[in-house]
Amino acid sequence: MAVFHAFRALRPTPEKAADVAALPYDVVNREEAKSIGDENPLSFLHIDRPEMDLEPETDLYDDRVYEKAKENLDNMEEKGILVQDQKACYYIYELVRKGKTQTGIVGCSSIDDYMNGVVKKHELTREDKEQDRIHHVDSCNANTGPIFLACRYPDSLLTLMNNWKDHHEAAYDFTEEDQITHRVWVIDEDEVISEINKEFAGIDSLYIADGHHRAASAVKVGLKRREQNPGYTGEEEFNYFLSVVFPYDQLCILPYNRIVKDLNGLTVKAFLGALKFNFELMLMPGFPCRPVEKHCMGMYVDGQWYHLKAWPDIYEKKDVVGQLDVSILQEKVLRPVLGIEDPHTDQRISFVGGSHKAAELAEIADRTGGVAFVMYPTSMEDLMKIADENKLMPPKSTWFEPKLRSGLFIHKL
């Protein structure tokens, strides 16, 4: 039984929503954030990447960075750019990309559900990244970015959302430069809010699709606040974290591709020879190779594209993690052939989201005489199965598109 909680969102006025909305903090680097922020003083990146408003040499984890985030957030609220709703509401958030629509409900998930496994994880988190977001949440006294969750939606909840959309005007409706449309409806009727609470109480599991570090950080902030307030009731806002829950079958997972800077001292001939023990190799002259089925991948090396198909005897079909394409690549190529022991920390490997063209990967690989791998995307079914078994996926296994925008909903603690 999932606990889902309506809340009083701090959010932009309708005329400012498109300007405030920003990509998540962790998909833009410092230079990109600075460029966006310089052009748009209302961008929420001024809160999520506040180092852009400090000296260029400022350390990302300097206390002044977190103080600046708080200052920028307060300024936007004081100027009336962000306004808090007067009553607790749910919100419908719809994204449309290339004709495909995903529609979810924005509310707050319980930190207890996270700890007892109702909110399920599939990815390891890094302590340094957790500490960064803990400091950010503490300083802002708010969850500033939603956790991207998925579940098996009951038909009745889908019907409720569609009925509300059909009979109410959207609070926000705008299309960004990337041609992704964002729409938001505010659910403010007590009867409908109660019905949503009941619907979620009948849902057994919520799955983190994206945002493991933000979720872990929000939970740790909540637990710390409980220690500081031993008389807490469980109803305080710090007991909940900002989430958007989508039907799992509406989501689009793109591949998370890999580029290795070199061939680990091997010649191209020796490298290709090593692959033939575990893969069927086919030269694909003249065009980039994108795999069209599981256990296949495209590879670019030394000016040529290849199609790789894993031999069926190199993975255990019942091993939900081991049969993932990213696992096969790691265990049969990256570790034994290319010497990538830990993809979390090895500086020779980089990860490129599936929104980038295959030709871009080839160009990057050519710069250092390396190799690029174009993966087949992991499925939501595999993700949920792994989470249900309390197992972990390899790092950078999934790339979700479209990216949820930060700044449309802020949950004050």
Region roles according to the model:
Residues M1-L413:
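Surface-exposed, charge/polar-rich loops and edge strands
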